[in-house]
């Protein structure tokens, strides 16, 4: 039995990353990407990759909403950028 295909984060919002996602998982991914972009502080994808040890194409995929970051990637990005990126618990009133 095959696994169902998981939609990408960008498919869970009308306009990535500008519009909030109705799906809570998509909204966490969108906010994570926003936090990552802010923490990059103008650095290029390649400079961020060198700093964090995360492949630049993975960084591009997260920022464009094409990929779901895994825990290993999240930890490497947060450590390398010395910034909290995970948006935390989203409440239904947000």
What positions do the PLM features span?
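Helix-turn-helix DNA-binding elements, focusing on the entry/boundary residues of the two helices
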Residues: 45, 56, 71-74
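Positions that flank functional sites
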Residues: 55, 92-93
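DNA-binding alpha-helical recognition surfaces that contact promoter or target DNA
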Residues: 34, 38, 61, 76-79, ...
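A generic structural signal for ordered secondary structure
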Residues: 46-49, 59-60, 80
């Amino acid at each position: 039995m095959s696994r169902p295909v998981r939609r990408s984060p960008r498919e869970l919002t009308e306009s990535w990353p500008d519009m909030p996602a109705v799906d809570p998982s998509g909204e966490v991914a969108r906010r994570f990407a926003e936090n990552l972009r802010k923490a990059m502080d103008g650095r290029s994808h390649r400079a961020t990759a060198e700093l964090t040890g995360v492949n630049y194409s993975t960084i591009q995929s997260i920022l464009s909403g094409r990929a779901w970051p895994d825990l290993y990637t999240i930890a490497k990005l947060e450590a390398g950028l010395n910034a909290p990126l995970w948006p935390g618990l989203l409440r239904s009133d947000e």
